[in-house]
Regions:
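Non-catalytic, solvent-exposed interaction/assembly segments
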Residues: 1-102, 106, 146, 156-158
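Active-site neighborhood for divalent-cation/phosphate handling
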Residues: 74-180, 296, 326-332, 345
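Glycine-rich phosphate-binding loop plus the immediately following alpha-helix
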Residues: 41-44, 145-171, 209-251
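Phosphate/pyrophosphate-binding loops at sites that engage ATP/ADP/AMP, CoA/4′-phosphopantetheine
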Residues: 56-69, 155, 233, 279-295
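Adenine-nucleotide phosphate-binding core of ATP-dependent small-molecule kinases
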Residues: 229, 238-294
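Glycine-rich phosphate-binding loops at beta-strand->alpha-helix junctions
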Residues: 270, 292-322
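Gly/Thr-rich phosphate-binding beta-strand-loop-beta motif of the actin/hexokinase/Hsp70
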Residues: 1-35, 68-76, 176-212, 219-222, ...
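Glycine-rich phosphate-binding/hydrolytic loop that grips phosphoryl groups
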Residues: 168-171, 304, 322-356
């Protein structure tokens, strides 16, 4: 049995998950979060590696995390994801070379400044050109990855792998595909909306294979700020009422109807851009020739703790919305709901490692 530690570095918090792998089970050994001050990570990019390293060390010490090798995820505006079609190539080395060539055509990063990875999502027969692959291509600015790695190494840890956060979300929030259905793209699509403090990641998959991913700059901080601007509450209090009162529900104990309605009105106004951008993402996916009907939307991320956000999105989007269960595939997964809400990426990283 070997311990694996995965670390999700967000704009407002660190989330670490340590799991145990044995022959027939995967169990949760430890999970913890550590709040971050503003400015260390901005829109998913590490801007102050030295200061961030101190908080990583604090998280390891407070939580009693034992592993020194970590798996990391990336998601920011300097990571580019493209869906391309190319001739199917069986040899892995030749395929990788072909992907590098395609990256030069599709990714707006100079080749010597980019780290490129890919995932084949479907192989199909084209009547005119034979076997072809649908490929999700990922490219990241090398200096952005270097800043992330630097912070982790300064904390005395060793990066084991770096993966796209979208892929990690698919592993933690969607059930494994039965062997009989592996490779089939005839199933309905599942959408994940991972709403963090400052960024939202929309991922759409069929049979756990990524077909679409989009990142945009909106998160829980904007909802909190909407309450601050319309009620003059301090930020800390606005953050609390955002979670406790939320967008939908009855009148909480200790609150009157007028104040509750004022807060919900502020949150509804603040949430409009979130609804619009998620809706645009879903509509764009639906417009693609390969799109499948979207069966449900799974809501994850720290902002999912905002009471009633799932119901609000379901009504606004006209689609079923479910709250995520990031630890559904782990045995003995007794975890605080506050920690669980922040752990979807970290759990997915722990379930498998990337190689960006």
């Amino acid at each position: 049995m070997s311990a694996v530690v995965s670390l999700d570095i967000g704009s407002s918090a660190l989330a670490a998950v340590e799991i145990n792998h044995s022959r027939d089970r995967v169990s949760l050994a430890n999970a913890a979060i550590e709040a971050l001050p503003e400015g260390l990570v901005v829109d998913g990019e590490v801007t102050q590696p030295e200061a961030l390293a101190v908080h990583i060390q604090q998280l390891w010490r407070k939580a009693g995390l034992k592993g020194k090798r970590v798996r990391l995820g990336v998601a920011n505006q300097r990571v580019f994801v493209r869906n391309v079609e190319m001739a199917s190539i069986e040899d892995a080395e030749h395929r990788a070379a072909a992907v590098q060539f395609e990256a030069a055509e599709h990714i707006p990063i100079p080749p010597d400044s980019a780290i490129v990875d890919y995932q084949v999502t479907e192989t199909f027969e084209d009547p005119s050109s034979g076997l072809r692959d649908r490929v999700v291509m990922v490219a990241a600015h090398r200096e952005m990855v270097d800043a992330l790695v630097s912070a982790v190494r300064r904390a005395g840890l060793t990066p084991e792998s770096i993966d796209l956060e979208a892929f990690a979300l698919l592993r933690s929030l969607l059930p494994p595909v039965p062997m009989i259905d592996a490779g089939s793209m005839d199933q309905p699509a599942q959408a994940i909306c991972h709403v963090g403090a400052s960024m939202t990641n929309v991922v759409i998959a069929v049979n756990r294979q990524c077909q679409f991913t989009r990142l945009f700059g909106f998160g829980g901080r904007q909802l909190t700020q909407a309450v601050v601007e319309r009620t003059s509450m301090p930020v800390e209090e606005a953050e609390q009422v955002k979670r406790a009162i939320g967008l939908v529900g009855g009148i909480p104990n200790g609150w009157d109807e007028n104040n509750t309605n004022a807060i919900r009105h502020a949150l509804a106004l603040g949430a409009r851009p979130l609804v619009q951008e998620i809706g645009r993402s879903l509509d764009y996916y639906r417009s693609q020739a390969f799109a499948r009907p979207i069966e449900r939307v799974i809501l994850s991320g720290g902002t999912s703790l905002c009471a009633g956000l799932d119901q609000y999105l379901a009504q606004a989007l006209g689609a079923p919305v479910e709250l995520a269960n990031p630890v559904m595939q782990l045995d003995d997964a007794n975890i605080d709901p506050q920690i669980a809400a922040h752990s979807a990426v970290a759990v997915g990283l722990a379930l498998d490692g990337g190689d960006l």
